[in-house]
């Protein structure tokens, strides 16, 4: 076929061009920081645009071009992986959540930042967050922020019903019933079946530890009694019709927050900016309480911690490292990111005197960071780690949760199925794996 | 001959002389009572409401601020601010929307023109030249019509990444140049509309094969060309999977990808809802106007090219 | 066209072997035969997604074709006012790309935003467009909205090419409108109907953009809702390109089998008059 042959020829010619282009420009390893550099940076963190503007003003030689992307698991990780696979089109820098870092390391997609300066800078960061981006002897990302959890709730609606912020999950279930009984349109929260990262954080809080590494062998322990306890707790609320099961971060949910049909949200510190951005008319009516507890010892969890990583194929790894460290340690940058609501800083001593330590109008004047999140951050079980196929595990949980919501099986079933499927995922990657801790 | 082929060739013998059968002045309608007429019009009107309702909603929504988008009825105006919204759309992020629009036009325009010429040439070769494996090629093309384009997008990505073309204009353009349906249509049409005697005569006059194709055959196959062009243009314009897989650089995005990007970013940046809606409005309205005003060509192309062939 | 398929088949029989917790010990592609196909067909979610698009096709295709044919016949009857306006109105959505149509309808399906849901609840109806029982048909509605007008136009074009003498003869013979439709029009537009049917089958089996856009709005759409979604997810979220390639090949085979099967069926069913 003439046409196909022509195309084949064009492809071949283009391929030759591409190869010559590759060989004529050496891979970006030049390490002179005074050299001009143009970097692209993918991020979805609110407020990061202002920090980037500030950097660009102060560093005319290293210009960063920010591209605001959808949240990582909403397609941006897919784009990064495909660009890495293709060997081109990946950004120099990217936002990567902690649970996704091992996956990028496995695909050989990240630059080891330790020899570029992170080795020296690492003392600036909170240990456990630094641990999330350290694999073996390498540091693959600059920690940015974590998401210590708390309970956002509509204080006005709770107190009208004579409810206090629930201190335990049992009290939470009682509150769920009181709220729904008083007004059938109202629910305490939604169990978003498509957002298993949220469920994972709740299991984390309950004391579960899903993943580990024993020498070269990955361990998977998702279906532990602890996790099953959490799953069956939400199963009971769902079966009693006391919670919604609509997707979070979606129009319907925003609409429910706005009109008071959803009155609470066990969420992370960064959740406040989501609420204030999407339900502006409810300002002043929210408060934050510590996450409800399972036991007498206070425990919290992290949801949505994130880092800034330098991707393979960058034109200037040194400049990129410099920017990534600045972004996450410079006081001015941190306060811009805090204003956007990026989470809890990974840099040490960021609370005192910063914009974090002040009352918030949206929360009716509560200083939630000081009251709740500081202690929450200190009570996270920091031994939690991830596996290179965390995204698959989330998918399995999502699929199982969605099936349960549609009336096929339960959340407990979903957790059990995810255990088996996760072991198969790691095996499919050609890795060694076993069940248990 | 398959049935689809008959779809194109079914009427060829009869209508070759009259190019526009619809204009033949004969009483083709049987007159009905007014009651019947009202009934039919009512049925058509109900269908029209269904097809136009989302367009109406989009138009109303495009005039709203983000807060009244969520806080007011979707059917009525509420402090209309269409102009502000549209200015936001075209100026956001350094005018990236205009870039996406141009990209869409580039992918669709160039893709459709080249695909049309290639398809006609290939179809003509398949129809008028005998060479080894001709039927095999034609059957491959036929199978190509049946294979969903999206099933090929992923393999194409892997292939393009091998040759380093991913995330370039080429990665979306090259696959768009291939139109098995166009080749198929080209062959059917060439069989019917290009008389062998005319070719013989030109060859006797000493015209080269290329000249014959570009001066004579292309002209004869114009109606098929219009159909293939429009078909391919809309196909590329609407394509989503291929650019999604191929492109990671936002400045290469077509409109479809860009708007989905805005829509999915909006979970953390609520102001982008209004941009996504305003962008949808801006991109849909011109195409709708174009489609309706080009309806004549669609019809002509379909009648001449597909149905009558 | 042939090249990507061949390459897909090559990728689909390949797997990967690694050593070390992060593959530091090196990784290499290995020939795994039909393992990826066995994995794909052994995964209940992927098989369910194939079943889902087939169910979708079985319902969607007749609805689409009947609607398009009915609209074409009504327009052609020309007993109505404003035929030109109606024809344009029906054809208009064809210019709206699938993803944009999905964004649009997504808003119209969302409780709290949608005038349709509000209207329904005012009437005491609890309309749930995004739930597990209805989401597939909500998607079908988007597809129908987008393409019914186009299919109608193809059929209208063939109706126009019917020789007017036939109608004259029919009216002289005293045929009524229904007889004209069933005896003359329908048999003569059969080729156009076959054509639109084949294209509708191919279109429905490759369902991707609509569920992708609606996924964040609906709990019922999983990452493997359709075969294409599953392949996309395997390739780019899970980095399992080999499995994704196998799924693409399977999808192409199913689509081919269906379209050819349909063509065989109508060809054997006797030739149109």
Per-region residue spans from a language model:
Chain A
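Short, low-complexity disordered leader/linker segments with a strong preference
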Residues: 1-39, 57, 413, 423-437
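Hinge/lid segment of periplasmic solute-binding proteins
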Residues: 98-148, 202, 285-289, 370-372, ...
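Conserved C-terminal helix/tail region of periplasmic/extracytoplasmic solute-binding proteins
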Residues: 159, 376-437
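C-terminal lobe and pocket-closing loops
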Residues: 102, 270-282, 294-396, 433-437
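A structural signal for short loop-to-beta-strand junctions that line the ligand-binding cleft
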Residues: 90-92, 120-157, 187, 297-301, ...
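Glycine-centered hinge/linker elements that transmit conformational signals in sensory
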Residues: 176, 217-247, 291
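Extracytoplasmic "Venus flytrap"/periplasmic binding protein-like
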Residues: 57-127, 160-167, 256, 260-265, ...
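Extracytoplasmic/periplasmic solute-binding protein
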Residues: 135-144, 149, 173-220, 226, ...
């Amino acid at each position: 076929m003439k046409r196909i042959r022509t195309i084949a020829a064009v492809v071949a010619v283009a391929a030759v061009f591409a190869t010559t282009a590759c060989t004529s420009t050496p891979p970006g390893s030049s390490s002179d920081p005074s050299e001009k550099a143009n970097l692209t940076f993918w991020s979805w963190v609110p407020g990061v645009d202002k920090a980037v503007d500030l950097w660009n003003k102060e560093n005319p030689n290293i210009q960063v071009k920010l591209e605001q992307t959808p949240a990582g698991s909403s397609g941006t990780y897919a784009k990064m992986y495909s660009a890495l696979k293709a060997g081109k089109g990946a950004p120099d820098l990217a936002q990567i959540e902690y649970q996704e870092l091992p996956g990028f390391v496995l695909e050989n997609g990240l630059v080891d930042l330790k020899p570029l300066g992170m080795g020296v800078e690492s003392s600036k960061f909170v240990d456990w967050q630094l641990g999330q981006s350290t694999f073996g002897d390498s540091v693959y990302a600059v920690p940015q922020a974590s998401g210590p959890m708390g309970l956002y709730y509509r204080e006005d609606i709770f107190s009208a019903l004579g409810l206090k912020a629930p201190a335990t999950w049992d009290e939470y279930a009682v509150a769920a019933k009181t709220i729904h009984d008083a007004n059938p349109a109202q629910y305490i929260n939604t169990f978003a079946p498509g957002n298993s990262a949220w469920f994972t954080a709740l299991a984390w809080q309950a004391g579960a530890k899903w993943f580990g590494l024993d020498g070269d062998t990955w361990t998977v322990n998702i279906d532990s009694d602890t996790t099953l306890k959490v799953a069956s707790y939400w199963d009971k609320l769902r079966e009693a019709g006391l919670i919604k099961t609509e997707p979070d971060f979606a129009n319907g949910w925003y609409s429910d927050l706005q009109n008071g049909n959803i009155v609470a949200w066990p969420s992370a510190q960064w959740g406040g900016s989501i609420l204030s951005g999407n339900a502006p008319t409810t300002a002043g009516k929210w408060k934050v309480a510590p996450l409800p507890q399972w036991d007498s010892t206070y425990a919290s969890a992290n949801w949505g911690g994130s880092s800034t990583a330098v991707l393979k194929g960058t034109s200037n790894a040194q400049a990129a490292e410099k920017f990534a460290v600045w972004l996450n340690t410079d006081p001015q940058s941190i306060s811009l990111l805090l204003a956007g609501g990026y989470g809890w800083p990974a840099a040490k001593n960021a609370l005192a005197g910063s914009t974090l330590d002040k009352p918030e109008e949206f929360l009716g004047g509560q200083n939630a960071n000081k009251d709740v999140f500081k202690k929450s951050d200190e009570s996270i079980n920091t031994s939690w780690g991830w596996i290179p196929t965390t995204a698959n595990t989330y998918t399995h949980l999502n699929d199982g949760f969605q099936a349960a919501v549609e009336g096929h099986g339960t959340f407990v079933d979903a957790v059990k199925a995810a255990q088996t499927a996760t072991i198969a995922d790691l095996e499919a990657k050609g890795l060694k794996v076993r069940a248990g801790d | 001959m398959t049935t689809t082929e008959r779809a194109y060739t079914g009427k060829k013998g009869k209508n070759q002389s009259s190019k526009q059968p619809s204009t033949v002045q004969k009483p083709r309608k049987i007159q009905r009572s007014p009651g019947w007429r009202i009934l039919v019009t009512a049925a058509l009107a109900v269908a029209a409401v269904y097809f136009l309702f989302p367009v109406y909603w989009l138009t109303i929504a495009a005039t709203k601020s983000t807060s009244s988008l969520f806080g007011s009825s979707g059917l009525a105006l509420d402090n209309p601010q269409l102009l502000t919204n549209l200015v936001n759309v075209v100026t956001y992020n350094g005018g990236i929307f205009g870039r996406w629009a141009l990209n869409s036009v580039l992918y669709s325009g160039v893709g459709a023109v080249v695909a049309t010429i290639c398809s006609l040439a290939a179809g003509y070769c398949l129809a008028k030249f005998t060479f080894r494996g001709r039927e095999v090629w034609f059957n491959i093309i036929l199978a190509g019509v049946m294979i969903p384009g999206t099933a090929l997008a992923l393999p194409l990505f892997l292939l393009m990444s091998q040759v380093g073309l991913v995330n370039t204009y080429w990665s979306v353009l090259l696959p768009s140049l291939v139109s098995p349906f166009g080749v198929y249509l080209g062959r059917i049409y060439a069989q019917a509309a290009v008389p062998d005697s005319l070719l013989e005569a030109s060859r006797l006059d000493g015209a080269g094969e290329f000249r014959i194709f570009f001066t004579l055959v292309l002209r004869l196959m114009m109606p098929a060309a219009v159909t293939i062009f429009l078909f391919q243009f809309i196909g590329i314009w609407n394509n989503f999977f291929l650019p999604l897989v191929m492109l990671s650089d936002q400045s290469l995005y077509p409109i479809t990808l860009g708007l989905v990007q805005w829509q999915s970013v909006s979970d953390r940046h609520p102001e982008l809802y209004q941009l996504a809606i305003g962008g949808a409005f801006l991109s849909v309205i011109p195409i709708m106007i174009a489609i309706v005003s080009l309806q004549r060509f669609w019809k002509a192309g379909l009648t001449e090219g597909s149905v009558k062939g | 066209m042939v090249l990507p398929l061949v390459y897909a088949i090559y990728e689909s029989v390949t797997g990967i072997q690694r050593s070390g917790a992060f593959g530091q010990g090196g990784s290499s592609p290995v020939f795994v035969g039909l393992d990826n196909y066995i994995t794909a067909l052994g995964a209940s979610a992927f098989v369910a997604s194939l079943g889902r698009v087939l169910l979708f096709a079985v319902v969607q295709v007749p609805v689409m074709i009947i609607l398009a044919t009915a609209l074409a016949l009504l327009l052609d009857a020309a007993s109505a006012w404003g035929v030109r306006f109606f024809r344009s109105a029906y054809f208009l959505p064809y210019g709206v790309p699938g993803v944009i149509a999905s964004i649009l309808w997504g808003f119209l399906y969302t409780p709290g935003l949608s005038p349709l849901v509000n209207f329904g609840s005012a009437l005491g109806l609890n309309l749930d467009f995004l739930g597990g029982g209805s989401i597939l048909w909500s998607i079908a509605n988007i597809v129908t909205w987008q393409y019914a007008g186009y299919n109608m136009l193809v059929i209208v074009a063939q109706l126009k090419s019917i020789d007017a003498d036939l109608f004259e003869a029919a009216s002289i013979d005293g045929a009524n409108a229904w007889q004209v439709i069933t005896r003359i029009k329908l048999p003569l537009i059969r080729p156009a109907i076959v054509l639109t049917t084949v294209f509708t089958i191919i279109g429905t089996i490759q369902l991707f953009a609509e569920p992708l856009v609606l996924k964040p709005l609906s709990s019922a759409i999983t990452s493997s809702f359709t075969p294409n979604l599953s392949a996309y997810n395997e390739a780019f979220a899970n980095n399992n390109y080999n499995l994704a390639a196998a799924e693409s090949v399977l999808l192409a085979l199913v689509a081919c089998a269906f379209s050819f099967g349909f063509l065989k069926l109508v060809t054997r069913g006797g030739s149109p008059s």
